[in-house]
UniProtKB/Swiss-Prot annotation:
Domain of life: Bacteria
Localization terms from the record: Cytoplasm
Protein name: Uracil-DNA glycosylase
HAMAP family according to UniProt: UDG (MF_00148)
One GO BP annotation of this record: base-excision repair, AP site formation via deaminated base removal
GO cellular component, one term: cytoplasm
Lineage: Bacteria, Pseudomonadati, Pseudomonadota, Alphaproteobacteria, Hyphomicrobiales
EC nos: 3.2.2.27
Protein source organism: Sinorhizobium medicae (strain WSM419)
Length: 241
């Protein structure tokens, strides 16, 4: 494993072989080329692995899987569906809050900063970890999907039962890497305004997740968000990939 990779230690141990694979070398080269050509990449380099940093492998209790980062200015910070404090809550997250209200009676937060979930063991993972500014899905097919497949496999191999919330057909592809005899897989349409009314609303995934965790002797997730979120802690230097 390249010692210059900046990654939380439990994930670094589990994912070390991935960084020695040729596809990661190609991905690194692609990202460097993008920046050299003046293209802005979101999130910032130090936040590519933010979801892994905040939720160590042995603490994962729930996985929520997104597609790729927000591509608007100031939005993406390495956690799927989450935005920085002070940034307007995106429509998909508004719908997630609506489902939380219907499911658990939790009033919608006045912000879209989900870091408190991550610190409780909710892995907020995008399938693709970078995007070009203003171009949705622009970094798909460059290697991130293979890397996040490895992330899901690593979670699946943990002894502790985990809940996988897979919203939309893109996220549901990752179910192939999950042992349903040990873990709970919950599927629903994506919370986007285009599909939320097709089955995301009413899915009750949040209460189902907590019921499963409790049944396994694990603490449930407190899905309430702090009224005033702390500022995200920035990593000082970007990872070498």
């Amino acid at each position: 494993m390249d010692s210059t990779i900046r990654l939380e230690e439990s994930w670094k141990a589990a994912l070390g072989p991935e960084f020695r694979n040729g596809y990661m070398t190609e991905l690194k080269r692609f990202l460097l080329d993008e920046k050299q050509q003046g293209r802005q990449v979101f999130p910032r380099g130090g936040e590519y692995f933010r979801a892994l940093d905040l939720t160590p492998l042995d603490r994962v209790r729930v996985v929520i899987l997104g597609q790729d980062p927000y591509h608007g200015d100031g939005q993406a910070h390495g956690l799927c569906f989450s935005v920085r404090p002070g940034v307007r809550t995106p429509p998909s997250l508004v719908n997630i809050y609506k489902e939380l209200k219907e499911d658990l009676g939790i009033d919608p937060a006045r912000h879209g900063f989900l870091e408190s979930w991550a610190r409780q063991g909710v892995l907020l993972l995008n399938s693709v970890l970078t995007v070009e500014r203003g171009r949705a899905a622009s970094h798909q097919g460059r290697g991130w999907e293979r890397f996040t497949d490895a992330v899901i496999r690593a979670v699946n191999e943990q002894a502790q039962p985990v809940v996988f919330m897979l919203w939309g057909s893109y996220a549901q592809r990752k179910a192939a890497f999950v042992d349903r005899s040990r873990h709970l897989v919950l599927t629903a349409p994506h919370p986007s305004p285009l599909s939320a009314h097709s089955g995301f609303f009413g899915c009750r995934h949040f209460s189902k997740a907590n019921a499963f965790l409790t049944s396994k002797g694990l603490d449930p997730i407190d899905w309430r968000l702090p009224e005033d979120p702390p500022l995200a802690v920035e990593r000082p230097t970007p990872p070498n990939c």
